[in-house]
């Protein structure tokens, strides 16, 4: 870092964000724990979409581990070693969750599209064995990209306030961080195209079936697609609109102090939207997994209402 950047108070005034991060954490941990319980209780036959949702849930638990540390660090009450740990480990867990979520939402969209367009066929990509294999490949790929940021040696710098994670990185660590950012943006762009195309094809197929006698199912399927698309756009698009300019400000390509501060605040605000997928995901589980819907029905509906609801849900296809 240059002297000019040393005196630029980029990493201050984070306390207002921490309250929202805490709210996301609280809602997310409750929803994720309930979802885990529901899947364990009810899921016996795993279809592809259930496998992808379980992987999404696993990624969400990584985020719940990381958020408390981020909150403590951003409040300015963390000891120095915890701040270093956050930069090396928990910050990376947040991004591991983000890109796993993006990829698995794309696979959910593909599976949904194939179910609607070719309902009488089962392709290799729709087999549970393939879903498990591709899930393992996705985890391995994301970890290979992210884990080096955790293990690359860092600089031993003097304890001080207003320090950013980039200041701990040596030259190789900075270069890897920059490469990681561009790879992640490429992942986002490619899987965004997949999600948009899959959902467009699915909506077109539903539009063709709008006069079908089974209209309630068509309407329900349309709702599922719109939920996935809306949660994806709200959570991930704003962050990636800011990510490249913010990365350039970290590497001194953008050196104006006021611009760097504005980009950092924009990054934190859009990161808050990105981690809010922790709150949206239980809603997706409810609409996309019959096992989850059944457990919610059993738990929260009155005994008189729960039985007919359960019978109706069991008669539906697991989506």
From Swiss-Prot:
GO MF terms, alphabetically ordered: G protein-coupled peptide receptor activity; neuropeptide binding; neuropeptide receptor activity
Subcellular location: Cell membrane
Keyword terms, alphabetized: Cell membrane, G-protein coupled receptor, Glycoprotein, Membrane, Receptor, Transducer, Transmembrane, Transmembrane helix
Induction: Induced upon antigen stimulation.
Chain ranges on the Extracellular side, renumbered to this chain: 1-21, 70-89, 154-181, 246-268
Transmembrane is among the record's keywords: yes
Membrane topology classification: Multi-pass membrane protein
Membrane found in the keyword field: yes
Gene null: resulting phenotype: Deficient mice exhibit stronger antitumor immunity.
Transmembrane segments: 22-42, 49-69, 90-110, 133-153, 182-202, 225-245, 269-289
Listed GO CC annotations: plasma membrane
Topology Cytoplasmic: residue spans: 43-48, 111-132, 203-224, 290-319
Function in brief: G-protein coupled receptor for Big LEN, a 16-amino acid neuropeptide produced from the precursor protein, proSAAS (encoded by PCSK1N). Acts through a G(i)-alpha-mediated pathway in response to Big LEN. Big LEN-GPR171 system plays an important role in regulating feeding and metabolism. Also plays a role in modulating fear and anxiety-like behaviors in the basolateral amygdala. Big LEN-GPR171 modulates the mu-type opioid receptor signaling and antinociception. Acts as a negative regulator T cell function.
Entry's family note: Belongs to the G-protein coupled receptor 1 family.
Name of the protein in its database record: G-protein coupled receptor 171
Organism, scientific name: Mus musculus
Classification of source organism: Eukaryota, Metazoa, Chordata, Craniata, Vertebrata
